[in-house]
Curated annotation (Swiss-Prot):
Gene: radB
Name this protein carries in UniProt: DNA repair and recombination protein RadB
NCBIfam families assigned to the protein according to its UniProt record, in alphabetical order: recomb_radB (TIGR02237)
PROSITE patterns: RECA_2
Keyword flag Manganese: no
Keywords, ordered alphabetically: ATP-binding, DNA damage, DNA recombination, DNA-binding, Nucleotide-binding
Domain of life of the source: Archaea
Cited function: Involved in DNA repair and in homologous recombination. May regulate the cleavage reactions of the branch-structured DNA. Has a very weak ATPase activity that is not stimulated by DNA. Binds DNA but does not promote DNA strands exchange.
A GO molecular function held by the record: ATP-dependent DNA damage sensor activity
Annotated organism of origin: Archaeoglobus fulgidus (strain ATCC 49558 / DSM 4304 / JCM 9628 / NBRC 100126 / VC-16)
Family matches, as InterPro entries: AAA+_ATPase (IPR003593), DNA_recomb/repair_Rad51_C (IPR013632), DNA_repair_and_recomb_RadB (IPR011939), P-loop_NTPase (IPR027417), RecA_ATP-bd (IPR020588)
Length: 221
């Protein structure tokens, strides 16, 4: 099946992805705070909303001002179904609701921003850790199945943690998230600029990087 590409609107990021985010699979964007993960998601949502509907699961509280900066035309934002979730269990319910929209509406992009923030807060309870980790994997497995079944692009953002043993910063979720995400982009600070690196892709060259700035208009170039 010929997959569609949804452009991010950033020349830097689109060059790494071969034109944009691919439908039929899961793309993971990870990085520390302030690297532009949500900005990139909003840019993707705007581009998709010009022709299709978008399901946006928001776990961190979208800034209304940032939405206005990126979208400009509020009528375009009416094509975005926003789910605000505050607990990890609600996130699973919202994902199920997004699947219904893929069936009933012209949804071509599903975003979960951030996929791991509510999971991370639940991890503080040691008694729940195994159950919570299984649920996270289950949610992403469901999203991947949804992407393939309805040929939609699924984009998740992921936070970082410092590995106590090695002192190295790593994305949350471990090998399961890495395996189920078929495309992975790492965002990081690089002095006054930001740097995007393609960690994993099915057909583009991995390891390539580019530099960008975060502005009122989004990610440039």
């Amino acid at each position: 099946m010929q997959r569609m590409l949804i452009p991010t609107g950033s020349k830097c990021i689109d060059s790494l992805l071969g034109g944009g985010v691919e439908t039929g699979t899961v793309t993971q964007i990870y990085g520390h705070g302030g690297t532009g993960k949500t900005t990139l998601c909003l840019m993707l949502a705007k581009n998709a909303a010009e022709q299709f509907k978008v399901a946006y699961i928001d776990t961190e509280g979208l800034s209304g001002e940032r939405v206005r900066q990126i979208f400009g035309d509020e009528r375009l934002f009416s094509n975005v179904f926003v789910y605000e979730v505050y607990r990890f269990r609600q996130q699973g319910v919202a994902i199920q609701e997004a699947e219904k929209l893929c069936r009933s509406e012209k949804v071509k992009l599903v975003i979960v921003d951030c996929f791991t923030s509510l999971y991370r807060s639940e991890l503080e309870d040691d008694r729940k850790q195994i159950k919570i980790k299984r649920e996270l994997t289950s949610q992403l497995t469901f999203l991947l199945g949804m992407a393939r079944k309805y040929d939609v692009a699924v984009v998740i953002t992921n936070q970082m943690f410092t590995d106590v043993g090695s002192g190295v910063d790593r994305p949350l979720g471990g090998p399961s998230l890495e395996h189920l995400s078929k495309v992975i982009i790492a965002l990081e600070r690089s002095n006054e600029l930001r740097k995007a690196t393609l960690i994993k892709h099915r057909w583009m060259k991995e390891g390539k990087s580019c530099f960008y700035r975060i502005t009122d208009r989004g990610i440039e170039p």
